[in-house]
Amino acid sequence: MTKKNHALIPIPGPSVWPLLGNLFDIDTEHGLASVLEMGRSYGDIFQLVLGGNKLVFLQTHALFDEVCDESRFCKVVVSGLGNLRAGVNDGLFTAHDGEHNWGVAHRIIMPIFGPIKIRETLGGMKDVCQELSLKWARYGPDHRIDIAGDLTRLTLDTIAFCTMGYRFNSFYRNSDVHPFVKSMVGFLREADKSSMIPEYLNAFRWKARRSFLGDIASMREMSMMILNLRRGNPSDRDDLLNALLHGRDPKTGEGMSDESIINNLITFLVAGHETTSGALSFVFYYLLTNPESLKNAREEVDRVIGAGNITADHLSKLPYIDAVLREALRLNPTGPAITLGAREDTTLGGKYAVKKGEPVLCMFHNIHRDKKVYGEDADEWKPERMMDENFNKLPKNAWKPFGNGTRGCIGRAFAWQESQLVIASILQNFDLTLDNPDYKLEIVETLTIKPGNFYVRAKLRSGRTPRELCGFSNPISTNIQIKNGTIAPANDGQVGNSTPVTILYGSNSGTCEALAHRLARDAPSYGYSVTTVATLDSVIGILPRAKDELVVIITCSYDGLPADNAVRFCNWLKTLDEDALGGMPFAVFACGHHDWAKTFYKVPIMIDELLARAGAHRVAQMGKANSAVSDMFSDLENWEDEHLWSSSSAAGNETVDNVARTEVKQDITITNPRARALHHNAVECIVSETHKLSESGSALKYHVEIQLPANMKYAPGDHLSVLPINPRQNVRRALARFHLAGDSVLSVARIGHMGTLGQETLSAFDVFASYVELSQPATRRNIATLLSVTPEGEGRYELAELGGAAFESQIRDMRVSVLDLLERYKAIKLCVGAFIDMLPPLRVRTYSISSSALWKPSHASLTISVLAQPALSGQGSFLGVASNFLADLVPGDAVHFTIRPCKKQFHLPDDASAHPIIMVAAGSGIAPFRGFIQDRALQRRNGVQLQPAILFFGCRGSKQDDLYRQELDEFEAEGVVSVRRAFSGEETVSISESRMYVQDRMWADRAEVIQLWNLGAKIYVCGGINMADGVREIFNEIVGPTEVDGKRGAESLNKLSEETMSARYVAEIFSQT
């Protein structure tokens, strides 16, 4: 025995029952799901005995890459695939390796699926695609569409019409599917199911066998009818059917027998439509459950194709659509596995023995999610990872949904073109929505997979009609511009030669996004047409590079790091060569807060420098907005007026008179029927519990528990974002100022600067409550507009002062809103449309989750500090929008939330037994640490030996806001955490709880802090900026030169490397909203 053989280890797997194999380990109705679930227990490889066959399952890229070597491994036809031979024998898909008829058919058919021939099929594909579009258009937006069913109809009709000249006319069969499809589904399902059952038991399944043979007979009869129809009606079509009938093998000179023709007709009718329809169904599932991806895909279609006829040239210019298809097939490959076998006895990975011909099933679902290839987020939907520049860098054999080598899918190019066309056509013509917003992905298994019970609704876009889909009316005017993925008429108010501008943002909290939309709103007044407003990550690899298209980027830093939707863009930007952007004009607007001095504007500055290094042309100096001392919207307006548009006007744009650039009014039609309900795209969740946490004497604090859908996952430290509703008090103020009843209906063309809404009809209450920021400080431009509609002598002088020298002290610093000014100066004659246009859209607010997902599955809790205080301006009260909204919730309320991962540094250490932790919080800043502690408690109860954890917690008083006291006492008794409280609002008898701030308590316990720090502790801080600064200052003293009991910290924070700091000391700073 060789040394190598000594290293061999057995392939793991469950125990095998005599005669039955692993039948009881598999759910025969959901075989694939069973195998995938089992695979999670065994790692990279395992084995089962099913249907009398020993099967080896591979789950990692490394092992799969090895078996893709065709000199060592070849296709093996066994199990479910082997059962298909009863219907199609040696067709292309089911032939054994080296089988003669496979070689003859393959050589005859190959030319039909060459690139030129595939392009020639586009007309036929569009013919069938039009039938789908007409069906959806005529049924209307309220019809519930079984999208997987309709895509099955489409792909069956497409393969039959384009390759055989035969029309199944599936869209004219009402709700029923063609008998061929029924037979095919039964055929595939039984082939799969019977493969898991021992042969001697299958012998007793007479009824199933009869149905199986009946399905085969039906499909062969249908195929023979198509064959005879062509023979009786000869055609000179250069298609698959004529190749099968008349082709000759260039190697042997042989033609194909009728038996072989029928085998391959069925093969193409089945394999040529079933996997494609599944792939398309998964594409639309992922697009509809990921609005940003849907927006990016639609924008690409609008930009490349517009509203015109789709051509083959268009399809070659859709990189994002290609990435979407690749990512859908990565996550859910519709042909979920291929089976290979060794040509000789060999080993895998140098340690697993496999015998010659032994079936090795390569499970694409897990291979395509290998974290060593795709990273820790391999299970997540991220089409950007499959853009060309990233896709081309993947290791070989990392993405194989079409199979391997010579036995790979011969019709891949056909399926790809068809998929591109269908996606582009549907996005071009329809707005799709989920029929059930809470739909959870279900998988229907035969030998292939597709989504089950997946229903959508389809509404024609941009006023298109079914007649236009038939080509009966004139083409839509080419005088269009694209905004936010919607096609809208070009702005008649633009002056000069309209120059395109792309506006990109990186934003976690929504502020930079709101600024981007405000800029988009302003651009037409300066002679620019906005082509898109999108996230930075959405343009990786497709950043506009034309010298006549301006790119404006608005972004910020989060503790020195990019926003979540800008991380991949920044990494990509660093890889660009000099002159890669070829003179692309650009400008950057930076947002920040000066309290983070070390990282102030760090990311915007980096982007500005990297763009210039890559050959882009800076047309204006970088704009800056410091939220600590100014209003960002005002800063943006100043930068626009003084730098951006004036600098870039040299390109040929005419500037616009200042008077013409004041706020644009819109017409609002007011009627009085009740409004329909307002819907948001976030996931609807149900409030399950609320209770007050604090007593009088401190800010009110509430505990809010939310029941989440099963597919909403989070980790301790992550965030929930909520789109709130404005306080009712403020809504009533706005209604009263414009003399509107709450149920008055506003027919609105747009809300603020969010872009075109298509004349939405909303109640006045909904508009003011759910769409706009009523408390946003007024900008100078807002005041200029108010001044222009104020009669002489009716406060004009005061308004002029407020818009001038007094702006910063009396408006910005006092946070005076437009609504405040309208109430203060009642003579202002502003229409409701102009008021709505002035206001930013209501933005999401983000809160730390105060629970562990493991503590109470499918639930998350929030810990809210309610902001309600006298307004700085002296006009009434200032109410935090989100905190008051959340505090008013009661069990049973439905609220729309999204999960936002925290920065990775704020997660708990992977190994709780290796790293101590120190948590520092004040007030509701305890939220993430409650989740940390719950998670640690569960680990301890599961036998994990925890390193020490200390929570320094600042409160006002023991009887006021000592949050979660009983719960924390129980955790402390278990040894999960040691809680050190600091009461800043009372004197107590206890020395350990004497009057102090949280940083004072840290100083008192500095010996333990130093001890844990020197043991590698990670420090987490959560609270307001003043508290965070105080904690950092005292911590710097603790770990600096000061000695305690002869011990001192390793080094001062100021001397620690940035890498060490980001890994070991991390803070989350919040503001009340």
From Swiss-Prot:
Q: What is its EC number?
A: 1.14.14.1, 1.6.2.4
Q: Which cofactor does it need?
A: FAD; FMN; heme
Extract the CDD domains matched here.
bifunctional_CYPOR, CYP120A1
Q: Where is the FAD-binding FR-type domain?
A: 680-909
The record's top EC class is oxidoreductase
Instruction: Provide the binding site for heme.
Output: 409
According to the lineage, what is the superkingdom? Eukaryota
As to how many cofactors bind and how, the note says: Binds 1 FAD.
Q: Indicate yes or no for the key word Metal-binding.
A: yes
Please name the GO terms that the record assigns under molecular function. aromatase activity; flavin adenine dinucleotide binding; FMN binding; heme binding; iron ion binding; NADPH-hemoprotein reductase activity
Query: What range(s) does the Flavodoxin-like domain occupy?
Result: 501-644
- What InterPro entries does this protein's entry cite? Bifunctional_P450_P450_red, CysJ-like_FAD-binding, Cyt_P450, Cyt_P450_CS, Cyt_P450_sf, FAD-bd_FR_type, Flavdoxin-like, Flavodoxin/NO_synth
Return the Gene3D superfamilies for the record: 3.40.50.360, Cytochrome P450 (1.10.630.10), NADPH-cytochrome p450 Reductase, Chain A, domain 3 (1.20.990.10), Nucleotide-binding domain of ferredoxin-NADP reductase (FNR) module (3.40.50.80), Translation factors (2.40.30.10)
Residues annotated as binding FMN: 507-511, 588-620
Keywords from UniProt, A to Z, are: Electron transport, FAD, Flavoprotein, FMN, Heme, Iron, Metal-binding, Monooxygenase, NADP, Oxidoreductase, Transport
**Family indicated by similarity:** In the N-terminal section; belongs to the cytochrome P450 family.
What does the function comment of this entry state?
Self-sufficient cytochrome P450 monooxygenase that catalyzes the regioselective in-chain hydroxylation of alkanes, fatty alcohols, and fatty acids, giving sub-terminal hydroxylation by acting preferentially on the omega-2 position. Prefers fatty acids as substrates, since it hydroxylates the small amounts of dodecanoic acid formed in the presence of an excess of 1-dodecanol.
- Name of this chain's protein: Self-sufficient cytochrome P450 monooxygenase CYP505AG1
